[in-house]
Amino acid sequence: MVSLDLEARLPAEADDRLRGRLLHHGKALVGTAGIRPGDRVLEIGCGTGHLAEFVARIVGPQGRVVGLDPRTVAIDIARRRTLPNFTACVGTADDLYLLENASFDVVLMNSMFHWIQNQEQSLAEAARVLRQGGRIGISALAKKPPHTWQVLFDEVFRSAGLGDSAGRPWISAYRLDSDELSHLLAKVGFQATSVGLRPFVDYFADVGEVIDFEFSALNSLGNSTGNFFAGLPAEKRAKVRAALAHELIAYDTPSGIRLDRHMIFALARKLWG
């Protein structure tokens, strides 16, 4: 049964739990990138460090992993993963100027590239910190087809009398298709070896868990609109909550509420930059 439990979670703790869901396509990204023992890896948008910890165990004592995330509270959690070859720092894709040229073998951007406004500049900086022949692995929300949750929230907002969800803060304006991402990579000195769509399926216990997951990315970016109910009057919040629970009935299965996601996966090598 779909639950109406929408108790507030502490953002960092919710992010830590729910980023575990992102780990399965993070692991797929790592496999695509061919990370090996001894590699020096930079993860931009590491959150609470789930994927960075996984990578640190692969690269071993001769390698190192640096994770960047804008939220101090997320980095505090990441630093509890006391692996000697993993360093977690507060920072964003705009802060790569602090890193030395050619200081990494691999750069990872797992489920965060679609939130970057100046994507070309960020990719150019990623190229700069990579050695010649270094690899970049990206997973990002695809422009098309839409995630199930996007279709779902469009209907929820219409039924609650709030229009549709287009332009809401969680609908990123910076989503790309495969051709656009390939073009950006080539423009800053990368040669794409693979770019394409991959589907993923998630199961959720209740409405609150759906909301936590879908907005944990915004919380990770330090965006206070991660809890989209906060800006609505109580009456509107109740309407959205009821409409969401009603719509999710159609997605309820014996395994939980099923929602599908469509991600672009890209791997490229640095030719110049």
Where does each model-flagged region fall?
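A short acidic, Gly/Pro-enriched loop at the edge of an enzyme's catalytic core
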Residues: D94-V107
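Conserved class I S-adenosyl-L-methionine
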Residues: M1-D39, H50-F54, A74-I77, R81, ...
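Class I SAM-dependent methyltransferase SAM/SAH-binding core
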Residues: L42-I44, T48-L96
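Conserved catalytic/acceptor-binding region of the Class I
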Residues: E120, R135-A205
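A short SAM/SAH-binding and catalytic strip from SAM-dependent methyltransferases
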Residues: V106-Q119, A142
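Conserved Class I S-adenosyl-L-methionine
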Residues: L4, L22, T48-H50, Y174-G273
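Short glycine-dipeptide loop
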Residues: P61-Q62, L130-I136
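Short, conserved SAM-binding segment of the class I
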Residues: F54, Q121-A126
